[in-house]
Curated annotation (Swiss-Prot):
Residues 443-582, 1063-1194 form the DOD-type homing endonuclease domain. This is Vitamin B12-dependent ribonucleoside-diphosphate reductase. The gene is rnr. GO terms for molecular function: ATP binding; cobalamin binding; endonuclease activity; ribonucleoside-diphosphate reductase activity, thioredoxin disulfide as acceptor. The keyword Transport does not apply.
Length: 1740
């Protein structure tokens, strides 16, 4: 009976497969050169027959079958084959053992066997999870399962049963927040079929639910959804997980590295790369540096090892330094984290908890510690020492964040290098837990303070022994009565009280008592005894109470003190109290015989908390009563917190607190009890003690938890007093804390601390003027060094974590310096964290072509700085790329040629927006400024936000510039009538915007009956009660809404003081400038305003040092001033035209109020109807006053008085004159605006006395249109305000531009498909490519990437937001070279290029197919409608060439137009690095770098052979160790080796076997069909010239490449330049293929001018021998082959030099782990390790 089943080594039973026996025997025959198919058939038949005979239907073990194979081969006389088979078995056994060792497993499973040793080594080194001992605890199966599970989670939430893309549903998000806060409790609780979701899967799932629910798209509640999941209603998606698992474990596709590492794990970040914007201002530069650090490090900073920390382990508390904590768990095993450049201890399996702060709930919580980190920070890193008013000290890295309380009671994070003196930090605070007093620990504390142990010797005959004796002392006999009561009750012992002078004591000899307290107090010399700490807070606080009863005292300062010689105990107690909000400090007190360390508490709130936690349990009644007396008499102290009264008032009012002002005092009323808060409302500073008293009263009245949390928060506050820096090298530490990412730590106290491609073209050039300082700018190269330094700080140990891409555009004035930025990088580390590229535009190529000078432009001014020779610039660029492999080039003109996202990304923009004229005033944080001035200022600052290509009119400008404006924020009720009507005034908030100068357009003036007016374009929209309405559609009688707001203290950019502002207001009202006499005159009513006249004179004398006298003329007083006072007034008012001086619009609110008070006191009055009036001949003045009044929420109306009036005037001679006026204007303030005016501005003297506010009505901010008059054309301006789309202009609410740009901060979400897996063989053994399966896999991978966006945990909120605006994905390829090997197609052939085009066309077509289907079900990406996709355009060059289509693109485009797309971009070809190693295939779209090279493993050295090449060698009987060595010595190439057949030499080509021209054609062929770019290296041999590089650039651009990275072999070398007398000759020098030659000739025919720059004949036919500059050392005997790490030994190079070169020339991972220097090779434009897969770009 035939055998049907076989037992594998892992115990699995699998079907018997005869083909596997055939393949094993065939390989053995090939090994010895036998290619006899007939003999093969005979042997296999006999083997199978023998198996059936011996086992007769039973199940043999695989080893039994292999034994039979050996015997049958020998029976057949094939002894050499049998030997080869035995060696094969042995080698397979060795491989299995090596795999077990790598994976830390006893047995391999089927998944493990699919991966090579090399793949498993890469997985083990970077991807698989490890335990506390550094052992691998995750198998490849488990890794790919967690990745697959996460990938399918979005499918559940997009299921039509729970999701509606058009829905408008409302769900309870509080339940969602509950699940997010408690996600740890749901670890492995839910399943999708057989697959359990871990807690991180669960958290990402709930987070996605929240996101979709916030958009109204979830049809069911979170509880209903989870119930469905629990019932198995989503189990159908198990097959999706199975499929992704199959695709990955069969190495058909691989996600990028971050996804493999972080899926289903705490970090959760799945993206490979990010775009960080950088603008031409210091804030943006520093923000870019910060964001680079955040992305590369994904955490905060680190703190000094001396900082103390309290943590809990297994319910036991510990108080140690950070350094001691690290050492405590070091036995669990350290690991080096090459991703983030640090040493760490994984304690995720150990229940360690620290005190963390939850900024949302404002309370102390327990934070789970997962990892303890250690960093070495050298001299190059500036460390910051932060010291608070309470003496708390933290020495930290510059990027370490702290929690800061703003004056508005908001909690923000600030890095150490952003902190300033006066900032309010959040420190230790009460945790709100109850506390139980335990006498046993009190007694231990008392013994520690006033007890001693000694050895007592018994001399009683027959009972001689030594035992421990405990003696306790105190001056109070009552203490011993209490102690004896406890001892008798607990131990059954009571001791007689003895006395020595004035001190009482007891002797305790009972072993059970002494041993008990000896054990409790063990370790006290090092701080609070561990046995007591372990028992938690109840034990520790009781212990401290005992200490205080023994050694503490209450002082009259007032305060409490505890002094001891045990420094570490005092330090521990200090830190412990601080952790609970008791702000204790330490001081040293000298004694004759040493030092006492004194802990003292003085702060009122801390004394209160000390009493509640400790003091009330003091057993010394005298101390307790004295402490109570101190508290009752405490005046609170004068320590003030700079907090905003109005913000607190708004919060406290919700809890029933009323506030009144009594003169200068602020009064809070709680249940009719009045509590003084000092002068808070006027000084915006409040005593901490006063605030704590008030909050305690409020909590007593309300018992509200939120009030309690606010009280605890205030108690925990400390203020930064000093900040110093040091560059001394230090070892720093940090923790990874789940959820809260912070912990409580510090020296001498405790505060909460957080754990832990760039385009420089917008930066102004070096030496340019900096507007804010008139200093000189540093230039982009300088700031590139800054970002580089940030990356070096992150690197910290010499091992690079990642690299930055720096781009400078060719028109920038610093372009020459940028090109040469790495010129000094010869054996050094200059800018080693940067790959740099030059961005080139069309105009440069035109200038090069025509031989014209090329202008370099200042990005700030737009002006030409100088003109350069483009040919010289081009040659410099090519030379540096030849010499240093940097910079690369980016062809921006090619990139933008098919950019369908231009409109959506904010540029180009059509500027057809509604606008206002230049003198329209816009509310900004700097003041109430004119639109034309805002544009000029913004342009000078140079921060461009967008560019318009259409709609800019005559005299307009295409660029928009960044500004900030103010908009009304939340409203608060200022007044409520008896009828229930309310008046609400808003607080303005600052929002980002950008301003346009649009040019000349037709405008109209809108006038209202109240006097307000605005001039704007006819399509400009104003807010009305019915909504937005265009100016051109307004008519007489229409209503317009005005915003009602009051500016805050931060408003305004200039200050003159309130007194001078009042003087200026009076002068505008009743003043005159005599420019001939150089004198300014002020006028006053002699009877009623003499006091004001004296005051104004005194103010001017005080400020300007002038002499001024008052002159009385009848009922008038005149004050004339000269000198500095005159010049000051003349400079401000300019002339006697009655207008508001421009400076007033920039003043601080109090100064504007003082100005208006002066103006109204001079020219205003209060009428009989109690209306406040201001009269003037100048209507313009009153209009301007209207605008100023609106800054305080005050409405007004202007009346025209056309009737004649008389003015009486008395001359200096006493003559009375009468002046008649034909008319004047009067501004009138009525209703509730009068009340606001009285409160905010007021009048001086008798006018204020006349003002009665008894009857006030609420007035509504609504005005009535009087007329709309078309004026003609004027220059107009507009503002784009993202998200808000409005701004305040002349008091009106105006609608802004409609375009909203896509900000930068996008991310790359990548995966690569292994092309080699789709090469199949027909029945004749002929290879073919399975296009159908390929199409299927492309769509699956596109879905995987689309899903990954939804479950990604992005490092910055900007990245999260902007990634989801476009949902850009990057389906890519790898294994191209291996696929071509299998198909027998040369890489550098017309057939090869054709295959590249087709395979990429399929990639993009079917990625789009998925995206269309996803759009139908899930919706389009948010910016879809703003792109050119709806117009039928695609960002794919091949689409515009129908003659080369293989697929129906026209039909696809129609589907896109009908249904839209889910993803803005879908394909790219990134570097694949280690991911291709995991997939056991060739890297990305590159040719292989070497077919054979030597490699070391634990069992020895062996030759690594490309698997496809190896199979072919064996198939042809060519395989041998001798041949492998020969190929390895031939630079890994088979070219020119007579042992290798010609057809194999043609197919099996390496990177350096291929001419650079063919490399470019390969890149262009692939680029043609990608939506994004292709990463590929243009390899050149060492002998290549600068002319070759120039030619490569020109040809690459003409062929449509989006960028080029040239790597000349050897240009990464660290050796100095040398001229080689005899040039080393490779055996083989590549020549361009015939197809490449044809393409080159076609380009030259089309663009003949390029012959001026390249030598076409030399490219086609090779060049003559000549001496060349080389980066190879002069004494080098042979070129190194990548991967042959034995070529360079660490001992040959100084250690410090090695450290500099890691990540630049040598692999950092191989050196750190194995001490080997492995040279990096260029692959896909990135320096990559050929051994472990480490990549400089960290893309995959």
């Amino acid at each position: 009976m035939a055998v049907e089943k076989v037992m594998k080594r892992d115990g699995r039973i699998v079907p018997f497969d005869e083909s596997r026996i055939r393949w094993a025997v065939q390989r053995a025959m090939w090994e010895v050169g036998i290619r006899d198919e007939k003999k093969l058939d005979e042997v296999v038949k006999s083997i199978v027959q023998r198996i059936n005979e011996l086992y007769d239907g039973k199940i043999p073990h695989i080893e039994n079958i292999q034994d039979i194979v050996e015997l049958e081969l020998m029976r057949a006389g094939l002894f050499e084959v049998a030997k080869a088979y035995i060696l094969y078995r042995k080698k397979k056994a060795e491989i299995r053992e090596e795999k077990k060792r790598i994976l830390n497993k006893k047995e391999l499973d089927e998944i493990d066997k699919r991966f090579s040793i090399n793949a498993l080594r890469v997985l083990a080194s970077r991807y698989l999870k490890k335990d506390e001992n550094g052992n691998i605890v995750e198998s490849p199966r488990e890794l790919f399962e967690r990745v697959a599970i996460l990938a399918v989670i979005p499918d559940l939430l997009y299921d039509e049963r729970v999701f509606d893309k058009n829905g408008n549903y409302s769900q309870d998000l509080k339940r969602v927040e509950y699940y997010l806060e408690h996600f740890e409790e749901f670890d492995r609780k839910y399943s999708i079929g057989k697959y359990k979701l871990n807690k991180y899967h669960f958290e990402r799932m709930v987070n996605l639910y929240k996101e979709l629910a916030e958009q109204g798209k979830m049809k069911v509640s979170i509880d209903e959804f989870l119930a469905m999941l629990e019932k198995g209603e989503f189990n159908e998606y198990e097959k999706e997980i199975n499929e992704y698992f199959r695709l990955m474990t069969n190495q058909i596709f691989m996600p990028n590295t971050p996804a493999l590492i972080n899926s289903g794990r705490p970090l959760g970040m799945l993206s490979a790369c990010f775009v960080v914007p950088i603008e031409d201002d210091m804030e943006s530069i520093m923000k870019a540096a910060h964001d680079v650090a955040m992305i590369q490090k994904m955490g905060g900073g680190c703190i000094d090892g001396k900082a103390k920390i309290i943590f809990e382990n297994e319910g036991e508390e510990h108080l140690t330094t950070m350094e001691e904590m690290y050492e405590r768990y070091k036995h669990l095993g350290e690991f080096y984290d090459e991703e983030y450049n640090r040493w760490g201890i994984d304690v995720s399996n150990v229940p360690i908890y620290v005190k963390s702060f939850d900024p949302e709930s404002k309370r102390v919580v327990k934070g789970k510690v997962n990892v303890i980190w250690k960093y070495e920070l050298g001299k190059d890193v500036t460390k910051y020492e932060i010291i608070t008013n309470k003496g708390t000290k933290i020495l930290t890295s510059p990027w370490h964040p702290f929690f800061v309380l703003t004056p508005d009671f908001k909690i923000v994070e600030k890095r150490a290098d952003e902190l300033k003196e006066g900032d309010i930090l959040i420190g230790g605070m009460p945790d709100g837990e109850d506390y139980k007093f335990i006498f046993d620990y009190w007694l231990a504390g008392f013994i520690a303070g006033d007890g001693c142990f000694d050895k007592y010797h018994s001399h009683v005959k027959g009972h001689e022994y030594i035992y421990d004796r405990l003696r306790i002392y105190d001056y109070r006999i009552e203490t011993f009565e209490i102690i004896n009561d406890y001892l008798e009750k607990t131990f059954g012992r009571k001791y007689s009280i003895q006395k020595d002078r004035n001190i009482y004591y007891i002797d305790i000899k009972a072993r059970n008592i002494t041993s008990h307290y000896l054990k409790l107090l063990e370790g006290i010399d090092n701080g609070i005894p561990p046995q007591i700490l372990k028992e938690g807070k109840n034990a520790v606080l009781s212990f401290i109470a005992g200490l205080f009863d023994a050694e503490g005292h209450v002082s009259n300062k007032p305060g409490i003190e505890l002094g001891m010689v045990n420094k570490r105990l005092i330090e521990d107690v200090t830190h412990y109290l601080n952790a609970l909000g008791i702000k204790a400090r330490i001081r040293e007190k000298l004694r004759k015989d040493g030092i006492d360390y004194v802990l003292h508490v003085e702060e009122y709130s801390s004394l209160l908390r000390f009493y509640e936690l400790i003091g009330k349990n003091l057993q010394n009644e005298e101390k307790r009563e004295k402490l109570e007396k101190v508290l009752s008499n405490h005046k609170g102290g004068n320590f003030g917190l700079p907090l905003n009264f109005n913000a607190f008032k708004e919060w406290a009012s919700e809890y029933g607190v009323e506030f009144k002002t009594n003169g200068s005092q602020t009064i809070a009323i709680i249940n009719d009890e009045r509590i003084s808060l000092g002068q808070w409302h006027t000084r915006n500073r409040v005593s901490k003690a006063v605030l704590v008293k008030m909050l305690r009263k409020l909590y007593e009245a309300t018992k509200d938890e939120e009030v309690k949390r606010m009280l605890h928060l205030i108690e925990g506050l400390e203020v930064v007093r000093h900040i110093t820096t040091t560059n001394e090298p230090r070892t720093f530490y940090d923790l990874t804390v789940e959820n809260y990412q912070n912990y409580l730590a510090g020296e001498n106290g405790m505060i909460f601390v957080h754990n832990t491609g760039l385009n420089f073209s917008k930066l102004r050039p070096e030496g340019d003027i900096v507007g804010t300082t008139t200093g000189a700018a540093s230039g982009p190269v300088s700031f590139m060094h800054l970002i580089d330094a940030v990356s070096d700080v992150i690197k910290q140990g010499g091992v690079r974590r990642g690299a930055n891409m720096g781009i400078l555009e060719i028109w920038h004035p610093d372009i020459e310096k940028f090109i040469h930025a790495k010129e000094k990088n010869i054996g050094t580390n200059v800018l080693s964290n940067f790959n740099i590229s030059v961005g080139i535009w069309e105009d440069f190529w035109e200038a090069l072509k025509e031989g014209k000078k090329y202008p370099l432009i200042n990005p700030r001014t737009g002006e030409v700085v100088k003109e350069v020779d483009p040919k010289t610039l081009f040659e410099e660029l090519a030379y540096m790329a030849w010499a240093k492999a940097d910079p690369g080039v980016i062809f921006f003109d090619v990139i933008n040629r098919r950019n369908v996202l231009k409109k959506a990304k904010g540029g180009p923009i059509r500027a057809t927006n509604p606008c206002v004229v230049g003198d329209t005033r816009i509310l900004t944080p700097e003041g109430y400024l004119k639109a034309e001035e805002i544009f000029s200022l913004a342009k000078e600052r140079g921060k461009k936000e967008a560019v318009a290509v259409e709609g800019i009119a005559e005299e307009g400008e295409p660029y928009a510039y960044s500004v900030e404006i103010l908009l009304p924020g939340e409203e608060k009720v200022e007044y409520e009538t008896v009828h229930g009507k309310v008046l609400a005034v808003a607080d303005p908030v600052a929002v980002p915007a950008y301003v346009w100068k649009v040019g000349r357009k037709k405008v109209a003036r809108v006038k209202t009956k109240e006097g307000y007016e605005i001039t704007a374009t006819l399509d400009h929209k104003l807010m009305t009660p019915e909504g937005w309405k265009e100016v051109g559609k307004l008519k007489e009688g229409d209503k317009i809404l005005l915003p009602r707001f009051e500016v805050e203290e931060e408003f305004g950019s200039e200050s003159i003081g309130e007194d001078l502002a009042f003087v200026l207001g009076w002068f505008i009202g009743d003043g005159y400038l005599n420019v001939n006499d150089k004198r300014a005159w002020f006028y006053f009513n002699a009877e009623k305003e003499e006091e004001i006249a004296v005051r104004i004179r005194d103010i001017l004398v005080k400020h300007f040092g002038i002499k001024a006298e008052l002159h009385r003329y009848g009922n008038q007083i005149k004050l004339g001033v000269r000198g500095e006072a005159y010049r000051w007034l003349e400079n401000i008012v300019k002339n006697n035209e009655k207008r508001i001086p421009e400076i007033v619009y920039r003043l601080k609110p109090r100064e504007i109020a003082a100005f208006l008070r002066g103006l109204f006191s001079a020219d205003g009055y209060v009428d009989k109807d109690m209306a406040i009036r201001l009269t003037s001949k100048s209507r313009e003045l009153l209009r301007e006053v209207q605008d100023l009044l609106l800054l305080f929420g005050i409405l007004s109306k202007i009346y025209e008085k056309p009737y004649e009036s008389e003015f009486h005037y008395t001359t200096k001679n006493g003559e009375e004159r009468i002046y008649r006026s034909k008319g004047y204007y009067e501004l009138v303030i009525t209703n509730y605006s009068r009340k606001l005016f009285a409160e905010k501005i007021g009048l001086e003297g008798y006018k204020m006395e006349k003002l009665s506010l008894k009857k006030t009505k609420v007035d509504q901010p609504i005005v009535t249109v009087e007329s709309v008059e078309v004026l003609g054309e004027e220059i107009v301006y507009d503002f784009t305000v993202p998200n808000y789309h409005m701004y305040i202009s002349n008091g009106f609410m105006s609608h802004n531009c409609g375009e909203e740009p896509l900000y930068e901060y996008e991310s790359c979400n990548l995966a690569s498909i292994n092309l080699a897996k789709f090469v199949k063989y027909d029945e004749n053994g002929k290879p073919y490519f399975d296009w159908d399966e390929y199409a299927y896999v492309i769509q699956k991978v596109a879905k995987y990437l689309d899903n990954s966006i939804d479950v990604n945990k992005f490092p910055l909120p900007e990245i999260d937001y902007n990634t989801k605006l476009t949902r850009r994905i990057g389906v890519g390829m790898m294994g191209l070279a291996d696929a071509l090997f299998k198909l027998g197609i040369p890489y550098n052939s017309e057939e090869g290029f054709k295959f590249m085009r087709k395979v990429t066309e399929y990639l993009t077509f079917y990625a789009y197919k998925y995206s269309v289907e996803a759009a139908k079900k899930r919706g389009t990406f948010p910016l879809y409608d703003k792109t050119e996709y709806p117009e039928g355009k695609l960002p794919v060059e091949g689409f515009y060439h129908p003659e080369i289509w293989n697929l129906p693109w026209d039909k696809l485009v129609e589907e896109i137009k009908k249904y839209g797309l889910r993803n803005a971009m879908v394909t790219t070809c990134p570097p694949t690095g280690s991911v291709s190693m995991i997939a056991d295939t060739s890297s990305g779209i590159e040719p292989v770098y070497a077919l054979v090279y030597k490699k070391s493993v634990t069992v020895g050295e062996f030759y690594y052979v490309d698997p496809v090449f190896e199979e072919e060698l064996k198939k042809r009987g060519l395989y041998s160790e001798e041949l492998l060595k020969k190929i390895s010595d031939n630079y890994g190439s088979v070219q020119g080796l007579e042992e290798i057949p010609e057809d194999m030499q043609r197919v099996f080509v390496t990177a350096l076997d291929i001419h650079w021209l063919d490399h470019i054609i390969a890149q262009a062929s692939i680029q043609m069909w990608l939506t994004d770019s292709a990463s590929k290296t243009i390899n050149m041999i060492n002998e290549a010239t600068v002319e070759d590089v120039k030619a490569a650039y020109l040809i690459a651009r003409f062929l449509g490449c989006k960028g080029v990275t040239v790597y000349r072999d050897g240009s990464l070398s660290v050796q100095v330049y040398s001229v080689e007398g005899e040039k080393k000759k490779r055996r083989f020098k590549p020549k361009p293929s015939e197809y490449a030659k044809k393409i080159l000739l076609e380009i030259v025919e089309k663009e003949p001018w390029i012959k001026n720059f390249i030598n076409v004949d030399e490219i086609l036919n090779g060049k003559k021998e000549q001496l060349l500059f080389s980066l190879r050392p002069a004494n080098e005997s042979k070129l190194k082959v990548p991967g042959r790490e034995e070529e360079v030994r660490p001992g040959n190079i100084p250690e410090e030099k090695i450290r500099e070169l890691l990540g630049v020339v040598y692999c950092p991972v191989c050196y750190e782990k194995e001490g080997k220097l492995v040279e990096l090779k260029m692959e896909s434009g990135c320096a990559t390790c050929p051994v472990c897969g480490w990549s400089k770009c960290v893309i995959s």
